[in-house]
Amino acid sequence: VNEADNAYVTAFRERLGLPGIIDIHTHFMPEQVMRKVWEYFDSAGPHIGDREWPITYRDEEQARLKTLRGFGVQAFTSLVYPHKPDMAAWLNEWAADFAARTPDCLYTATFYPEHGADSYVEAAIEAGARIFKVHV
């Protein structure tokens, strides 16, 4: 945990009198997908006005969880998202498992505009998905 960041966030939270934080924009994905997302952002400059889009907390899953909890985050999302067909259903399965083994993660699901999306979206809702992340 970056101690300076931790001190800043803790002071901010305490100044506002907040007992904790809910972070609705955190990403946890299968390791191979997470690494590809990081690689994309590393090379995104030409697509976003030739500026960098750095990822500050590029750590292993357990280290990122420790950082969030150190900031006083009481609940957060996994925000999985597919970038092509035939990804969403298995990402939803991964996210359900992640939420089951990580009680402070709100079960997040996703969908892609593809044939059959309605069935895996319905299954995710029935399984308890509380948040959907979608790129349209």
Where are these regions (language model features)?
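Helix-coil boundary/capping segments in enzymes
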Residues: 1-136
